[in-house]
């Protein structure tokens, strides 16, 4: 039995039945990482000794017949912008190279409390800015389905770790699609929860009104399991909602009779690959066969979402990244004349091109004379987009669309074409701007590459997403796909 190919719920079953030890599971994954990660590039840091130590502790509890917790013995990878005490937290940037976190993020605390085994920190686009993980300062992450293609981004390492069987579960962050798009490209399940459903405390900020931690897994049940473990109120993050977290496992049923699904025409227009369109339309038919009522709908303001997103997120990034100045921690230039020179050279040398591009854009739209014309207007557009979604959700339980207009593109294909790269998030960005939840799951294969189906629902209706996603998933076999790597 290849333990690395099993889902989290399958591992939980054999662990609780004492068919396998937690240490055996952990060593299987560490061996897998040592075997393949030099080609896949999922990990920036592996915590081998600590992982084995935790596994042995769990085995001791099992021997005493103590009750297992939600994630007991399950290997988890953490994106390298989410703090884990004692591990590096570089955000895949030269400016934070060598930085070790002195504390745990709230989501990390919750994973540890539920006895998940953290294997290490995962590769990403620098400061979560990118759609291909080509912006990492340290190494490329590659798609397990085709090593010449990108895994998506910015949570590319998180997707690769799960798809490449280097972790059972992983955490990413999603600001404009950074969990859903790599989940689509790598053929796994990824959730962007409602803004405020999961704490951002201890997550390095990119766009503070957009950032959300998102769980990733091999199937919908795994994703629901991890969401249940990490969701809920956190007093350290005032944006988290004081709303009870439902038992998402109860939503995992094929019964979706009477559920109303809208198909927005704006997500099926120009730029959508015809083969992707066909795969998504076939998935919609399956949902209809399972009892859902499917009707067309319209979200006319979606064309403005991408522009609003890049103005708002870049403005917030320019403010958030001002703290990285070469003084208290992180990279400091060795050649400087005075304090101002330290700031200038440390940031110029420490940040990559995409990060500098977004800082400049953000500083520009916040500057005198342009604030009203760009930033203030983008906030107004954001409000209108939220209203657009609320109007549609009065008539529908969910909206269905492609996750990305294409399958995974080749490494280097869009690296120097900024607009083309930004457009790869055209179907995920509107959801982030509105703050509503969405899930991506595999719905087909095109020329050996996975296609992603995106299901979107109203605020705090993750249970609806899990219900619809599970119903579709269990009606097809795409969730059983494993990259032959």
Curated annotation (Swiss-Prot):
Swiss-Prot/TrEMBL keywords: ATP-binding, Ligase, Nucleotide-binding, Protein biosynthesis
Pfam families: Amidase
Family: Belongs to the amidase family. GatA subfamily.
SUPFAM superfamilies per the UniProt record, alphabetical: Amidase signature (AS) enzymes
Protein name: Glutamyl-tRNA(Gln) amidotransferase subunit A
GO terms under cellular component: glutamyl-tRNA(Gln) amidotransferase complex
Record organism: Clostridium botulinum (strain 657 / Type Ba4)
Reaction(s) this enzyme catalyzes, per UniProt: L-glutamyl-tRNA(Gln) + L-glutamine + ATP + H2O = L-glutaminyl-tRNA(Gln) + L-glutamate + ADP + phosphate + H(+)
Active site: 79 (charge relay system), 154 (charge relay system), 178 (acyl-ester intermediate)
Keyword Nucleotide-binding found: yes
Molecular functions (GO terms): ATP binding; glutaminyl-tRNA synthase (glutamine-hydrolyzing) activity
Enzyme Commission identifier(s): 6.3.5.7
Function: Allows the formation of correctly charged Gln-tRNA(Gln) through the transamidation of misacylated Glu-tRNA(Gln) in organisms which lack glutaminyl-tRNA synthetase. The reaction takes place in the presence of glutamine and ATP through an activated gamma-phospho-Glu-tRNA(Gln).
PROSITE patterns for the chain: AMIDASES (PS00571)
Gene3D superfamilies: Amidase signature (AS) domain (3.90.1300.10)
Protein's UniProt keywords contain ATP-binding: yes
Enzyme class: ligase
Assembly mode: Heterotrimer of A, B and C subunits.
GO biological process: translation
């Amino acid at each position: 039995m290849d333990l690395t190919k099993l889902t989290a719920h399958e591992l939980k079953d054999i662990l609780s039945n004492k068919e396998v030890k937690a240490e055996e599971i952990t060593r299987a994954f560490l061996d897998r990482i040592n075997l393949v990660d030099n080609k896949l590039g999922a990990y920036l840091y592996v915590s081998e000794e600590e992982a084995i130590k935790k596994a042995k502790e769990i085995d001791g509890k099992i021997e005493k017949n103590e009750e297992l917790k939600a994630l007991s013995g399950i290997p988890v990878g953490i994106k390298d912008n989410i703090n884990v005490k004692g591990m590096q937290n570089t955000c895949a940037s030269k400016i934070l190279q060598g930085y070790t976190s002195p504390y745990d993020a709230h989501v990390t605390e919750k994973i540890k409390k539920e006895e998940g085994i953290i294997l290490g920190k995962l590769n990403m686009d620098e400061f979560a800015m990118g759609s291909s993980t080509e912006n990492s300062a340290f190494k490329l992450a590659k798609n397990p389905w085709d090593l010449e293609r990108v895994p998506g981004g910015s949570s590319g390492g998180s997707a690769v770790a799960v798809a490449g069987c280097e972790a059972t579960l992983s955490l990413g962050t999603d600001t404009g699609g950074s969990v859903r798009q790599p989940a689509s490209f790598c053929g796994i399940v990824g959730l962007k929860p409602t803004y405020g459903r999961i704490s951002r405390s201890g997550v390095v900020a990119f766009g503070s009104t957009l950032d959300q931690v998102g769980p990733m897994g091999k199937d919908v049940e795994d994703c629901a399991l991890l969401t249940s473990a990490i969701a809920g109120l956190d007093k350290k993050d005032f944006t988290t909602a004081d709303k009870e977290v439902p038992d998402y496992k109860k939503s995992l049923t094929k019964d979706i009779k009477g559920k109303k699904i809208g198909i927005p025409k704006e997500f099926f227009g120009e730029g959508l690959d015809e083969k992707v369109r066909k795969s998504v339309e076939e998935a919609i038919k399956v949902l209809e066969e399972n009892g859902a009522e499917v009707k067309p709908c319209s979200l006319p303001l979606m064309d403005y979402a991408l522009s609003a997103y890049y103005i708002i997120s870049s403005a917030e990034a320019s403010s958030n990244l001002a703290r990285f100045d070469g003084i208290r921690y992180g990279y400091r230039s060795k050649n400087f004349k005075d304090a101002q020179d330290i700031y200038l050279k440390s940031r110029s040398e420490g940040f990559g091109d995409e990060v500098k591009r977004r800082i400049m854009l953000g500083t520009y739209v916040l500057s005198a004379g342009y604030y009203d014309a760009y930033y203030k207007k983008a906030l107004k557009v954001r409000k209108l987009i939220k209203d657009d979604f609320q109007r549609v959700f009065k008539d529908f339980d969910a909206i269905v669309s492609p996750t990305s207009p294409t399958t995974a593109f080749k490494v280097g294909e869009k690296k120097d074409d900024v607009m083309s790269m930004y457009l790869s998030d055209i179907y995920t960005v509107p959801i982030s701007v509105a703050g509503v939840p969405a899930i991506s799951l595999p719905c087909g294969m095109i020329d050996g590459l996975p296609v992603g189906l995106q299901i979107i629902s109203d605020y705090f209706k993750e249970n609806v997403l899990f219900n619809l996603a599970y119903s579709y998933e269990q009606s097809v076999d795409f969730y059983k796909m494993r990259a032959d790597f």
